[in-house]
Amino acid sequence: MKKYFALLNTIVLTFMIHMPLQAQEIDPMSDTWVCNDGLGRVVASMDRGVTRKQVDENCQVGMFYYVWHGQHGAEVKDITRLLEADPVNPAWGSVNQFHWGGKPAMGYYTGGDRFIVAHHMQQLMDAGIDFYFFDVTNAFTYDAQVQVVMDEIDRRMRLGLKYPKLAFLLHSSSEKTSLHLYEKWYKNKPENDHYWFYWNGKPLMMMDYDARKTCDAAVRNHFTLRGSWAWEEGEDKWPWLAYYPQNYNFSNETGKKVYEQMTVATAMHPVSKIGKSYSGGSEPAVNKYGLTARTSRGAFFEEQFKQAIKMHPRVLMLTQWNEWMAQRFVTDESNKALTRPGATPKAGETYFVDVYNQEFNRDIEPSSESLIRDNYYMQLVSNVRKYRGAREIPVPEACKSIDLSGDFAQWDDVTPSFIDEPGDCEYTSSTAQKAESLKRRTNDIVLCKVAKDADSLYFYVQSTKHLIAPSISNAETWMTLLLNSDMNYSNGWEGYDYMISRSGTGDHYYIYTWNGETQKWDEGKEISWIKYANQMMLSMAKSDVALESDVDFDFKWIDNTPKNTTEILDFLCNGDVAPNARFNYRYKGSKLVSPESDALQHVDASGKRARVEVYNLSGVKMMTAVCSTSLKGLGQLCLPQGTYLAKFGNKSKKFTKK
């Protein structure tokens, strides 16, 4: 018995030593962020596009994830570049050599690059992904690269950030590979339990369907096992690829049929000529580069996601994030139909099984290629929200004037708080980031707020540490505020009508207006601002940014992004932006005067409440406010200076807004 307790204590102590400490959870509410994608499509939110009334917490979304880059040869051969140079006779690499299908937005990278792993995880958590399933289908397990992903999970856990759970997808040599993975990561390693995606009370492992019964007994006992391969649907099967319309996959383990999983992909294979534009049972015509007129739009992805949203399975497995590479093979007379898209089928022609170009690949990760960019990532975000649901965009509670000569405690009771993750400036990458951004340190933005009164807008921003002092070299990229005042993403620069930024010649902030004719920012009025330690606030007249009315608007803070950038993909990994990527926060300014809102109940907390109509002295109705029936405190309403008449039932009262 003493030995038993000694062993138990050892296990518990070991677990406590190695288990990362969980910080208080930080929730940036990324499902409330808004934007349009590069094609002008609205990313779904509760303001537009999401019809599910509440978030379904039982939904789990997994992403097929790869760490194999650079592990089978470091030379970069890019099919897209080769086709651009000569689409008829490209300068291929050797037979069996891995080729990239295009260039990622963060550049060609090596599996296990900490900067890349961290930014992938941030992007996927923002998208609502719950777990990764690693590709180990060819029996290579990439242990060192998997460890880097685990390290990033631990880092996020220490910061209190959401992180993905993990599972493995096997195929070739499933028996041998599953035993290796079990002994490497699972056996007698309770300190690793927080990594795993659990299904039916055990870690999930996917493998060859028949190998589930022939693999080692320790594997069978430790895992919930599901068969997984392309197009294999049915009982105890979780495929990673299926034809539209995809079916539910189910289990009968308990003697009762339980519907479990469905897959969604962005395309199939170059050899089958089913690409990203395939829908309605056909692939559009491809040109000599193997591209279609609608490669950028994700028709296959949308068709499959609509089926998943309709059927609403408990687990949705997405194919895929970042395969990027495929081996070069050559046809013979027996398989010349496999010839690459856009080329004449013949023996001796090159083909690639899984990845070819922008049209024929299954990746979602943002790309530097002109037809892809971040279109598929934004399509992912939008459809995950439609599938699971999204939270309401938070609304402000009260109007408030901020005195810039006062202290920062004025902001303590201002809501909502717009959160940005801490720690997203921890790593740098000379291959992924612009050189000018790397030369400077970046402020790690974590909190933003907005306040308003009748005439002015006030903005607050906070970083994790003291704000790094601006210099001449980064004056125009230092702690800059972007405003989309009309929420119209078809005008301005990427929708932004105003930029509030320092000038390059002095310690002053100005309002810059986007000039559609010159495609440049025009300097305008100087505004007031103040910073102290890790906080900063600024103010401007509503009229200076076309926000005289009480309306909603979108905004974003950026720091140390490339100077004079006209490339919004720079926001993926250069400097810090809040919120991430091309997303924006939405300030629901209209809610402060909505008749249905309780936002104005701060007027007199002791009185009874009713809807009070407010008129100017010309008889024009200005607003309907919820306030006390005693009509006290009317001067606190969000109105321009002047005299007004408030009416409630047969009561009326003149009051002055100072």
Predicted regions and their residues:
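N-terminal module-boundary/linker segments of secreted carbohydrate-active enzymes
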Residues: Q24-G70, H194-W196, P203-L204, R212-R220, ...
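N-terminal carbohydrate-binding/catalytic regions of secreted carbohydrate-active enzymes
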Residues: A44-V148, Q320, W324-E365
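Aromatic-lined glycan-binding groove of carbohydrate-active enzymes
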Residues: R48-V67, H72-G73, P203-M317, Q327
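Acidic/polar low-complexity flexible segments
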Residues: P394-S405, W478-G506, A533, K542-L592
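Short, well-ordered beta-strand segments enriched in hydrophobic/aromatic residues
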Residues: G406, D455-K465, M536-K542
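C-terminal outer-membrane/trafficking sorting elements
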Residues: K591-K658
